[in-house]
Amino acid sequence: LSIRYIILGGSFAIFLDSDHLLQFLDIELVSRMSHSIPFAVIVSIVFFVILRGKDIRICAVAFGAVLSHIAFDIFLADVALNSGTEFPLFSPFTFETVSLQGLDWLGIQIIGVSIVAIVSYFYKRKEIKLKNNLTKT
């Protein structure tokens, strides 16, 4: 991945906590709603539509950034507070929170990195195949 994707993923992962700004303004909302799997899927679809499907890696990076952010929050709660944390992982379908703690962050991080790696591999493979087809004709 290029540095552009790394910066985008990191920025997006930080941007996920912008819901805390709304809480400071006493706006009623479901806390950590952006820390959910449906949100990650929606963000990926939005990027796909905006980019007109030209680069699917951005979609994977966005999805991976949400998972990475969730993993970091779990890691931080475990290391700094010696406790777990809860997320509404399936909001807006259900607002029940899922408790995560300990090494749960590692599994989530591995899933996020794996998604980006697999999508990048297939994207590059397709790109090379197209390039080879163009040079043959």
Model-derived features: where do they sit?
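N-terminal membrane-targeting hydrophobic helices
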Residues: 1-137
